[in-house]
Amino acid sequence: MTDKKYIVALDQGTTSSRAVILDHDANIVSVSQREFKQIYPQAGWVEHDPMELYATQSAVLTEILAKESIRSDQIAAIGITNQRETTIVWNRETGIPVYNAIVWQCRRTASICDALKEQPGLEDYIRENTGLVLDPYFSGTKIKWILDNVEGAREDAEAGKLMFGTVDTWLVWKMTQRHVHVTDYTNASRTMLFNINTLKWDEKLLKILGIPLSMMAEVKSSSEVYGQTNIGGVGGTRIPIAGIAGDQQAALYGHMCVEKGQAKNTYGTGCFLLMNTGKEKVTSSNGLLTTLACGPKGEASYALEGAVFMGGASIQWLRDEMKLLADAKDSEYFATKVDSSNGVYVVPAFTGLGAPYWDPYARGTIVGLTRGVNSNHIIRATLESIAYQTRDVLDAMQADSGIKLSALRVDGGAVANNFLMQFQSDVLDTTVQRPAVSEVTALGAAYLAGLAVGYWESLEELAGKAVIEQTFEPHADPVKRKQRYRGWKRAVKCTQAWAEMHDEDFE
């Protein structure tokens, strides 16, 4: 055990940058957060300014240490967790990005993916070697788009002048004064360029997409010292950066789901269900991803993942675009003012459908509207859609793995909504466990960093600190459960291939 007092987790998310300080008992001492701008150049396109990502992340770190009067020599290590797949390409010499960060939600490369699907055997090769599906969601086609569309980028890349990184790589490179170009297995596994069998960059895929190997970062485990940073505050001590994991894998680790068959769902902007499958690579036949997660010591292990693109973002849509809510937190109050959704289903496929459908051309739909439907029914149906989408993924996961979950661990902003959690339990017919500490993603990053530097000796030491705040048990009528879910499946069919079939109608 070290005599340092604190661990810091940096959580660079889709809408905000956060810093979380933990003490040796894994208690949260303080949290600091700054939001940043979402950029929408065209319909279906989503970008961030990479310099703003770094500026907000470094600002919250400096801010939180100053606020708590904590010196850098009191920090044992920093762990980083980040929005995954989001793609940044920058100049190795100047450090300036050649284009905005293309965000995981961005669908601009759908046509590139369609063209690649014409290559015989390529989809199967990608599935077998990266564990992913050929979809705009992942980094590979985003890098290709930048190299193909930014003037001079392809030439500079071929000359070895450009670097690629997911957000973790960009932050570490900046925080170490441009000395360390590194990523971890969990983030690498989300690029569609990393071979999860050999644990190396896949040179065949790099060649197909026209991406030079020189752009790619060194790939390491999720729990080791990658470099040092002097950003943070007074004390004069450089702080080790000792943990990196993509946000969903960090949450899985924060829940201590490190053994085969343990699973969690994170309800954030999107919803992400992960099940650890240990050393066994399970290839999905139900539209799920095979990805890399963290074993007990931060080493690479395998997991199944299902991604729902619109989770909490659908509630933001009710608030910001539909003006049905003043505050997202009010959704529970209005949803419980009615006894049911009155036959209404909302399918929030605003940017396509993720697992298990993988339809980039699906678009959002409200079905079952009658004269008796009011705003409360639509709010309730939107909340219910989050639970139904989770059921879609969990059914596929259990079919692939052969494991029936006894309980689902949950985290993320929406888990504070008791209506949603109870409905989730009812829809799944499974126990839902909500932990006392909501910052599970930050916990995972902190645990990985702390274990790397000896701040904590083992996961067993941490296990006693985990507390379940509330357990939700299913109590829905089995016949009604089946009927409701059948209605959901019919509603999903109404959304599929909409943009592909109807785009010309809007020209």
From Swiss-Prot:
* Catalytic activity as recorded in UniProt: glycerol + ATP = sn-glycerol 3-phosphate + ADP + H(+)
Control of this protein's activity: Inhibited by fructose 1,6-bisphosphate (FBP).
From which source organism is this entry?
Psychromonas ingrahamii (strain DSM 17664 / CCUG 51855 / 37)
Primary enzyme class: transferase
Biological processes per GO annotation = glycerol catabolic process; glycerol metabolic process; glycerol-3-phosphate metabolic process
> Which keywords label this protein?
ATP-binding, Glycerol metabolism, Kinase, Nucleotide-binding, Transferase
Signal sequence region: none
The keyword NAD appears for this protein? no
Detail which positions bind ATP. T14, T15, S16, T269, G312, Q316, G413
What superkingdom heads the lineage? Bacteria
Q: What is this protein called?
A: Glycerol kinase
Q: Which GO terms describe its molecular function?
A: ATP binding; glycerol kinase activity
Under the heading HAMAP family, the entry gives:
Glycerol_kin
List positions binding ADP: T14, R18, T269, G312, G413, N417
UniProt: glycerol binding residues = R84, E85, Y137, D247, Q248
Q: Which GO terms describe its cellular component?
A: cytosol
Identify its protein family.
Belongs to the FGGY kinase family.
Main role?
Answer: Key enzyme in the regulation of glycerol uptake and metabolism. Catalyzes the phosphorylation of glycerol to yield sn-glycerol 3-phosphate.
Residues annotated as binding sn-glycerol 3-phosphate are T14, R84, E85, Y137, D247
Q: Report the PANTHER family cross-referenced here.
A: GLYCEROL KINASE, SUGAR KINASE
Name its pathway.
Polyol metabolism; glycerol degradation via glycerol kinase pathway; sn-glycerol 3-phosphate from glycerol: step 1/1
What is the E.C. number? 2.7.1.30
